[in-house]
Structure formats: structure tokens, C-alpha cells
């Protein structure tokens, strides 16, 4: 029996223009009324996911920076990683390549976001790996992370916090940065717009896309 659902935001709750599906919000609220714990896991910053928690009415903790920072129900913020190394790497690479900072970095505490020209991507990825850092593109922005800082880490935190077994957890996501939580022995679902590797890892692939899948996913797993 599933007791907790961890949901990605961009592309999973939102459409191509990053507008949240109002239908998804309705189904989340219905599931919560049945006692399901819902958590959001995003690559975005804590102020953004905090606002989503408040205005949607999310009843579980929410994670920003792909699991690097958590806002809990008691109002506390836990930072699991530091952005000291990632910011230093950005400073170094910005002098050698087109790698450049983005607006949301003023709120990032555990990672670094950036823009970059395609010609420099392979070089920056290789240099980051030498320093024990990870570079990936979420489909919406570039992220520079510490090793181990991912959504799989966040799901493990939720599992421990609520004393759950993996088979009591459902994860829903659409892109490559969601794969770490899809590699755990949990239930997995995705929208029709998901990447091929996410679809292959999923127990259920919805026929709907961009947030409209939440109702079908929740119905499939008997959460409504």
C-alpha cells in the first residue's frame, strides 16, 4: 500500500510553458484527504518550492536543488550539501568558457545553476567530474551538483523520516534528473512526455502529458 508520493515539478506537474496543471492540484488534494503524504522534489530553489507547498497545499516536506535542501512542515530548512565547491567551479570556468551564472543562484544554498553555450558543455562536464562534481541539464536549466546530491537522496530522507518501506513509496517524474529516484526499489510512474529511460524504468506510463497524467497515475495506484 502506497503511503507517500514524491513528485517532480517541471514537466511532471507543469506544461511546456511551466504552467502548473490545475487538474493535478485537484488530484493531489484528493489523495491527501485520503491520508497520502505528498512531497515535491524540484531542481528549483527553496523559495519556489516553498511557495508551491503553501499555495497548492502540499502536506509533506518539499525539496529544492534536486534534493540538496529541504523545507519541512515545522518551518525548518535543512541543507544537506554546500555550494562552496560548485560556486568556486563556476567562477573558475566563467573565465575560460561561456559558463555563466543565472538569476536563481542568489537563492541557491547547495548547488549552482548556470547557462552555457553548447560548444563548451563537454569540456565543463569533464572538468567538473575531475573535481567530484556533477553537471546535468534538466530540460529547463543546467545544474552543477555535488556527487550524491539528487532526488534519490531526497526519497531516502523521506523514507527514513516517515519510517516507510520502499514499496510504500511512489515516485513520479519525467526527465533524466529524476532517474536517481527511479533507480530505487519504489513504485515508479511518468507522464507520456517523459524521456525514454524514465519510461523504461517506470511501472506505469500515463497516456497523458505535462501534469495531466497525475489523475491517471493516482487512479492506477489506488490513491483516489
Curated annotation (Swiss-Prot):
Membrane-crossing ranges are none
Binding locations of Mg(2+): 8, 10, 174, 178
Cite the Gene3D superfamilies for this sequence.
3.90.1070.10, HAD superfamily/HAD-like
Q: Needs which cofactor? A: Mg(2+)
Q: What would be an example GO MF term here?
A: phosphoglycolate phosphatase activity
Name the residues annotated as catalytic in the UniProt entry: 8
Top-rank taxon, per record: Archaea
Q: What class of enzyme is it?
A: hydrolase
Its keywords, alphabetically, are: Carbohydrate metabolism, Hydrolase, Magnesium, Metal-binding
State the InterPro entries in the record: HAD-like_sf, HAD-SF_hydro_IIB, HAD_sf, PGPase
EC numbers listed for it are 3.1.3.18
Which residues participate in substrate binding? 151
GO cellular component, as recorded: cytosol
Q: Which reaction does it catalyse?
A: 2-phosphoglycolate + H2O = glycolate + phosphate
Instruction: Sum up the protein's function in the record's words.
Output: Catalyzes the dephosphorylation of 2-phosphoglycolate.
Q: Which family does it belong to?
A: Belongs to the archaeal SPP-like hydrolase family.
NCBIfam families named in the record: HAD-SF-IIB, Pglycolate_arch, PRK01158.1, SPP-subfamily
**The name this protein goes by in its record:** Phosphoglycolate phosphatase
Source species of the chain? Thermoplasma volcanium (strain ATCC 51530 / DSM 4299 / JCM 9571 / NBRC 15438 / GSS1)
